[in-house]
Structures are given as structure tokens and as C-alpha cells.
Amino acid sequence: FYERKEIKDMMAYLQVVNNPADEIRLRRIINQPKRSIGDKTLAVATEIAQGIGETLFEVISHADEFEALKRTSPKLLNFAQIIQELMKAAEDETVSLADLYELILEKTSYIEYLKTEYEDAPRLISD
């Protein structure tokens, strides 16, 4: 069960919401579902982050401030905004883990992604 891609993706989302500096999991989810943020863009953002001593998430959150990321900054900023909204929800003591999970599915359009990518989406969604 835990080896399935969609489970790993959701676990990675929860972990990034808890710790946005988790670059490994951030890289896993930045294009899940697809957001057209390429490896080259991530490499440039990583290089910037290392150069200025910030996390990859911080650079993504301020992508419009970096000339090398201007072209893809709307996509990066959109992703960062989703994560920031989820982080804010996670800090709210009235939001349960189940609520946060549902919010991740909603904000990321992950259910729609599963429906378009997998024939057995109804089974995946019910799990």
C-alpha cells in the first residue's frame, strides 16, 4: 500500500507542509500533478538557493525576484502559494489531519489528476 505512487505523493505533500525545507520531497511533489516545472528550472532554482544560502522553497516562493526564473515564476509562485495555504491550515488547531489531507487533494487537484492518468482511478481514490 505504502509503495504506491499516489500514497508516496500524499505523504510527501504532508511532509513538505510540515517542513518546506525538505528538498527531496519538495522535488517529488512540485510536478504532482503536472505543473510544467521542468528539471532545468529546478536546477536553476537549486543553484540560486545554494548561492544565496536559502532553501529551495524560499527561492520558489520568491521566483519573480530572480531573473533566471522570470519565465517560469508564475508556475513556481502558484505552487508555493498552494503549499503556504496548506501550511497555514496545518497550523490551525481546528483542522484535523483528515481535513488537511482533503485540503491537499482539493488545492492540488490531485483527484482530477488521478482520473486523467489512471484507468483504475476510482479504486485509487477510494483507497
Regions found by a protein language model. Give the residues of each.
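Conserved helicase C-terminal RecA-like lobe
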Residues: 4, 11-127
